[in-house]
Amino acid sequence: MAKKVEKVVKLQIPAGKANPAPPVGPALGQAGVNIMGFCKEFNARTQEQAGLIIPVEISVYEDRSFTFITKTPPAPVLLKKAAGVEKGSGEPNKTKVATVTKDQVREIAQTKMQDLNAADEEAAMRIIEGTARSMGITVQ
């Protein structure tokens, strides 16, 4: 018989840098999960993606065991990395902070494709371009 899921915890953690301090510790402590076990497993699974923020969905079962799924980094994080900026524009319609090429957008769309609600690569690119526009990043 399959184990019953008691709780699902969603977090965004820097790759390879999970530790028992907030926000990880309190979120998992309330669910009764072995925090150090999760941190070690997460860090081992994400060490090659250092510098990126990784969304993770942790399923906690009634016997306090857990499984987790790592997702692709959020589109704004990938766009900031591609554009080489620290943060997006405070006034995206007035102030443009950077420029990315169509090829960079295509690469990000291919990376995000599994998590996006898009039928094909072109639709995924349009989603990423919209995110870029809302951050004050120009697409050429």
Swiss-Prot record:
Keywords: Methylation, Ribonucleoprotein, Ribosomal protein, RNA-binding, rRNA-binding. GO terms for biological process: translation. CDD domains: Ribosomal_L11 (cd00349). InterPro entries: Ribosomal_uL11, Ribosomal_uL11_bac-typ, Ribosomal_uL11_C, Ribosomal_uL11_C_sf, Ribosomal_uL11_N, Ribosomal_uL11_N_sf. Disulfide bonds: none annotated. One of its GO terms (cellular component) is cytosolic large ribosomal subunit. It comes from the Bacteria. Pfam families: Ribosomal_L11, Ribosomal_L11_N. One or more lysine residues are methylated. One of its GO terms (molecular function) is large ribosomal subunit rRNA binding. Part of the ribosomal stalk of the 50S ribosomal subunit. Interacts with L10 and the large rRNA to form the base of the stalk. L10 forms an elongated spine to which L12 dimers bind in a sequential fashion forming a multimeric L10(L12)X complex. Forms part of the ribosomal stalk which helps the ribosome interact with GTP-bound translation factors. Belongs to the universal ribosomal protein uL11 family. This is Large ribosomal subunit protein uL11.
